[in-house]
Amino acid sequence: MRSKFDTQLRELGEKLTLMGAMCEEAIANSAKALLSGDSELAKKLAPLDLEIDQYERDIETLCLRLLLQQQPVARDLRQISAALKMITDLERIGDQASDIAEIIPHLKGRTGSECQAMRPMAEAAIGMVTDSIEAYNKRDLALAKSVIEHDDVVDDCFLSVKTALIDMIRTGHGDAEYALDLLMIAKYFERIGDHATNVAEWVEFSVTGIHKSNEI
C-alpha cells in the first residue's frame, strides 16, 4: 500500500513540475514576444494556456484521490494540501502570461525603451516561478524563502515602470493608449511574481507545517 502511495506522490510531483515548466514557457514566450514585437508568437500562446488549465484539473483530481483513498497524515498530507494550493497560483500565472500575449498585437510591433524596461521584471518573474517549483521538488526551504524575498525585486521594477509610464501619460510625451497597454502588462508581471511568492509560501508550509497566514 505504501509503495503505491509513494508512486502516486512521485506522479504528483512530476505533474506539478510539468505544469510549472509550462508556466515558465508561457511567461518566457510572452516576454520574448513583447520585447521583440513578435505578434505572431504572442498569438500562438493560447493553446499552452489551455494545456496548463488541463494540468490543473488533472492534478486536482489526483490530489483528491490521494486524500480520499490513502488518508495521508503529517508530512504527506501537507505535501498534497500544498500542491492543491499551488496549482491554483500556477494556473493564474498561465492566465496572466496569456493576458500579456493578448495585449501584444495592440502594441503594433513597438519595442522602444518603455517596452524594454519590462525586461528585468520579466526575467525576475520567470526566475521566481522556476525556483518555486524547484523548491517544491527538493523540499528546499532556503530556496523557497529566497523566492519570497525576491518578490521585492519585482515590486520595485513595477513601481519604476509604472512611474515612468504615468509620467509619459501625464506630460503627453507619447501615445497614452500605448502607455496604458504597457502599464497593464507590467501589472500582469507583478501579479506573476505575487503568485510565485504564494507557491513558495506553500512550499514552506509543506516542509514546516507553518504558513504565514497562521490560519493553517
What are these regions (language model features)?
Residues 1-216:
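Cytosolic, long alpha-helical scaffolding segments
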